C-alpha cells in the first residue's frame, strides 16, 4: 500500500557559476497521485546521481526539457510498482527509469523499464540505465575499440568511467585509468582489472602517459576536461578517437565568467595525428539501447562486470548526495537508498 503523502525535492535556485548548495533545493510533501491509464505508481528504492544533473538545474543542457524553479528535481531511480494503469506493469514489478527525486512517483509507463531478473536494483542503476548505456554506446559506437588498443579514461573511478574500463577489457584493450587518490587507483587495478592507473593528484599525467603508453593513446575517453584533457591530447596516437562524455572540472564555473578554465592548448595535435574529437549524447543513440541493455545484463550475470555503488541513505540526504560527486568523494556509482535503514 502507498501512503497518502509523498515527499519530493524541488529545484529552488539555479547553481550557475558556483557549486551546488543545500539551499538550491526545497523538500515538500504532497498527496500521492493515483495512476491514470498509461501511468504507473512506483515506490522509489534507490535514486541515481550524475554530474549532468547540475547542468539540468542550470537549464544548460539543450537536450533536456527546461527544469522550472519549483519543479521536481529530475533524475533516475529504481523501485517497485505499487499500482499500475498500464498492462505491461503490475504490482511488485522491479523497475527503473525517470522517477525524479520523489519517494513515490507516478510516471508514464514509457519512462520505465523492467529490471532484468537476477540483477539487484542497486546493480541495475550502477550498470544499466543511463550510466551503462552511456558507457557502452560511447565506447563501442564512438570509440570503436579494437583488440590491442590502449584505452585511457579520465574520471575512471566514477560510475561511467569504471564501466568503460571494464567494457574495454572485454573488448581486448589495454586500459589505463586516471583517478584521484591511491584508494581509487588501487580499486581500478586490483578489483576491476585495469592494466594501470594514474593518480592525477600526486603524479604528472602527461609524463605518466608517456611512460605507460609510449606508442600513444589509441582511444581517450574523457569525463573531466581541463588540464587532463590537455595532457591526453598531447599523447594521442595516429587517428585516435577522443570521446567527450563529460567535463566535471568545468561544471562549477559560469561559461561567461573569466574564471572559466581555458580550453585545451594541445588541440592542434589533432591535426598532426589525424585524430578525431566527438561528443556523446545518449539520446542520439536511442535505437541502440536494447543492444547495450542486453550486453550489459549478460556481462553482469556472467561476472565479467563488477558493479560498485557508493550508497548513501535517507531521502532527506538527496542534495548532499549529489554534492558528493563534485567533491570527488564517490567511488563507483553514486546512489541514495531512500529508506535510511
Regions found by a protein language model. Name each.
Residues 102-103, 180-188, 262-267:
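Short, glycine/polar-rich helix-capping loops at beta-to-alpha or helix-loop-helix junctions
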Residues 205-214:
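Short amphipathic alpha-helix with an adjacent loop that forms part of the alpha/beta core around
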Residues 94, 150, 174, 240-241, ...:
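Short glycine-centered segments of the SAM/dcSAM-binding site in methyltransferase folds
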Residues 73-80, 90-155, 304:
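NAD(P)H dinucleotide-binding glycine-rich loop of Rossmann-like/cofactor-binding domains
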Residues 227-305, 338-341:
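Glycine-rich phosphate-binding loop and adjacent beta-alpha segment
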Residues 31-49, 57-101:
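Glycine-rich beta-strand-centered segment in the early N-terminal region that forms part
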Residues 2-6, 304-311, 319-341:
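C-terminal capping/lid region of NAD(P)-dependent oxidoreductase domains
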Residues 126-203:
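Mid-domain Rossmann-like dinucleotide-binding core that forms the NAD(H)/NADP(H) cofactor-binding site
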Amino acid at each position: 500500500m502507498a501512503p497518502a503523502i509523498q515527499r519530493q525535492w524541488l529545484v529552488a535556485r539555479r547553481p550557475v557559476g558556483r557549486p551546488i548548495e543545500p539551499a538550491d533545493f526545497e523538500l515538500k510533501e504532497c498527496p500521492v497521485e493515483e495512476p491514470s491509464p498509461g501511468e504507473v505508481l512506483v515506490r522509489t528504492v534507490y535514486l541515481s546521481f550524475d554530474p549532468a544533473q547540475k547542468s539540468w538545474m542550470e537549464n544548460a543542457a539543450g537536450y533536456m526539457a527546461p527544469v522550472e524553479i519549483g519543479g521536481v528535481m529530475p533524475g533516475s531511480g529504481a523501485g517497485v510498482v505499487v499500482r499500475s494503469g498500464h498492462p505491461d506493469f503490475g504490482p511488485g514489478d522491479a523497475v527503473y527509469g525517470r522517477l525524479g527525486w520523489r519517494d513515490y512517483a507516478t510516471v508514464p509507463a514509457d519512462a520505465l523499464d523492467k529490471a532484468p531478473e537476477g540483477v539487484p536494483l542497486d546493480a541495475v542503476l550502477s550498470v544499466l540505465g543511463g550510466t551503462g548505456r552511456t558507457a557502452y554506446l560511447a565506447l563501442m559506437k564512438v570509440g570503436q575499440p579494437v583488440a590491442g588498443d590502449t584505452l585511457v579514461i579520465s574520471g575512471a573511478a566514477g560510475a561511467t568511467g569504471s564501466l568503460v574500463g571494464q567494457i574495454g577489457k572485454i573488448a581486448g584493450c589495454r586500459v589505463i585509468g586516471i583517478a584521484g587518490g591511491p584508494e581509487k587507483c588501487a580499486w581500478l587495478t586490483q578489483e576491476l582489472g585495469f592494466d594501470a592507473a594514474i593518480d592525477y593528484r600526486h603524479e604528472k599525467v602527461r609524463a605518466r602517459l608517456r611512460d605507460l603508453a609510449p606508442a600513444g593513446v589509441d582511444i581517450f575517453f574523457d569525463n573531466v576536461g581541463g588540464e587532463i584533457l590537455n595532457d591526453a591530447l598531447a599523447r594521442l596516437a595516429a587517428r585516435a578517437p577522443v570521446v567527450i562524455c563529460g567535463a566535471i572540472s568545468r561544471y562549477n564555473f559560469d561559461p561567461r565568467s573569466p574564471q572559466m578554465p581555458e580550453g585545451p592548448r594541445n588541440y592542434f595535435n589533432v591535426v598532426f595525428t589525424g585524430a578525431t574529437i566527438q561528443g556523446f549524447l545518449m539520446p542520439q543513440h536511442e535505437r541502440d539501447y536494447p543492444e547495450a541493455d542486453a550486453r550489459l545484463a549478460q556481462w553482469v550475470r556472467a561476472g565479467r562486470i563488477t558493479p560498485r555503488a557508493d550508497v548513501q541513505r535517507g531521502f532527506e540526504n538527496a542534495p548532499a548526495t549529489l554534492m558528493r560527486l563534485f567533491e570527488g568523494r564517490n567511488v563507483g556509482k553514486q546512489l541514495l537508498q531512500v529508506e535510511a535503514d
